[in-house]
């Protein structure tokens, strides 16, 4: 007899193989089979399969084996054989699914566009998607506790970035650029020297973001790029001033600059290479400083000690360098697809608080270049730009940086960037006060008078950076009432946020002081504040799919005969879901912390993540980051349970109850586990579609949940997506003030990141003061992070820039929609070509109502509009 194997090969039937599989099954249940019985079993199998057409199928042989065991009443052995058979079938089917998925990724035949920043059709995109598919299966089948894997598969709790779960990568990070600029950075191939000009500063910003993005799966941020740039703008000013001074010497006029620039030589003793022109300048720098009596500290904009002619020449060259450097930075961050071989790094920059002329010029250059556009005037997608709003600095006329705020508004109206972060957010203020109180308690606890005096004798700059100063007259430590730049509110673009660090303790601060006293300088691997943003990040997020729990609760309550208790059933289920989410995050956190330093050597060698102590492993740094418990579908959940969303007072009441539970549980876990659990309002780029699809498959079309009623036919049609986090649904016809009023009641519960945005029409550029009014109103309402969406379309055929509706032709040249870039905000970041969005995001983008349609005072004028909300804004701002 012949047998057809599963791979298609044909081979002779072998009785020995029947004996082997029966013995394996009997061994599994520890029931021996003697030789006589084994002979009978094999004989039965042979007689049964010999009647079949050759070649015999494997499944038929296995059926015969089961029949033989049942015939001789070997039920336990038959069950063991059957279970093993089912297990092997599942493995084979899983392998088939994986191979099928790999084929689809390789051929780009089933493009999902799960990430609008990735081209899944490209070589790099297909390669990346194939690897990601394998790693996701690895995570779900072998890495994650099967309880959590089941919750993920059944649409209860979503495990983000499963491919990175398998690898043990963390999410995102605010890079400590101040340290990198001062010390330089080490890469695998080269050491990059410290910056000594604004042009090298912006180059290192771009390079640093790209290098760090390869160590993680989320975004990278600069928390105060305008302040960070100041020292290097001053270096540039000094360099240009020196050159201007040298040009006045007769010697300069007789130089052969080309020959000197090309004349390099190697130093015999050290092997270091030098350049004759650079040597000539360096040799005369000492002479210059001696003759002029100047030092580095004298080179700042506005110093009247400097020679006016030389100063103006140097200032002109410095301003040009700033503008060109910023332009180059934007080009680099929009063009160098260094992430996974086919993506741009998800990068963000925060600015707006620096009041020095140098910092103001840098901010001005960012905004002017953003308005102008990159390349042939295209909107800059990266970095995500965040303007930091703070009373007394930039929120009203007379404030030092109010003019920059006005320019930011002009930029937002044209390019959507910058977004706006509220540096007076009530949650941030409470966290700052708590951090300062912790430090004060630690300082007051110092028992040794000798150590106390050593701390008191630290340089003012160090004390200031640590948030205190020693009052010599009163002989006491006093705490600063202002934040350091690395403490101020900033965000990592999409919305992620770092709040109060539970692991920045009094003991930690005292140890920091001890190390500082010993060395006379601040240790670079330590954190300096409990609310520090630099060197911290979101370690890992998970998201609870609220509509799933809501529908299950409603069904259970109805089944139990108590439909009026649906909300109570839901709240109980949600509490358990949050508990499960916490357990899963701890499992993932422990796996991340189990990775070696070699897995992200660039990050650890350069102290990118603060708090790293080699003897304690990478957990010493990871524990200062955030573990985020997220959510999706608040609006749909309220519809399921109450028949309304959060715009209705009943809906808002339940929404607050839900968020309070999130907040209470996260605070409880934070204290219990000494990990920074936080409430996260999930961006949900692909999840908005995948969670919806699974829900729809199970529960079908439900009005205002998975479907909307067609206004013409009255038929229910699929919506295509779930609403992100706690947002008011995009299809609601409300004014921007109503949307802000609604969401402002919920954002205060979030400690790990949130965003509020409004949709503005294509006349935003003609309503700048009205747009400013909206931003200030959001701030007055204690909105954390705010953005405006304006319709931006660019024709790649003729360069036309203006509002072009989806699926329309260019009004200037008639080019088809495929030649038109439609920009839209997807998760906090911008994306271009809505065709590259996943199906759910395409539906959501098209559903967005322009909120200004419902604001009667939105007019084509730059005059301040009369609005009942405006007085409130003015009073608050």
List where the protein language model places each region.
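Conserved catalytic cores of very large enzyme subunits
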Residues: 97-623, 644, 648-822
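Short, mixed-charge aromatic SLiMs
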Residues: 44-50, 69, 654-668, 845-858
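Contiguous, well-ordered alpha-helical segments that form the cores/surfaces of helical PPI scaffolds
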Residues: 627-640, 660, 825
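Charged, amphipathic alpha-helical regulatory modules used
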Residues: 1-105, 109, 848
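Short, hydrophobic beta-strand segments
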Residues: 44-50, 347-348, 636-640, 754-760
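Long insertion/accessory domains within large nucleic-acid-processing enzymes
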Residues: 811, 816-873
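Metallocofactor- and cofactor-centric catalytic cores in central/energy metabolism, strongly enriched
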Residues: 320-324, 640, 841-845
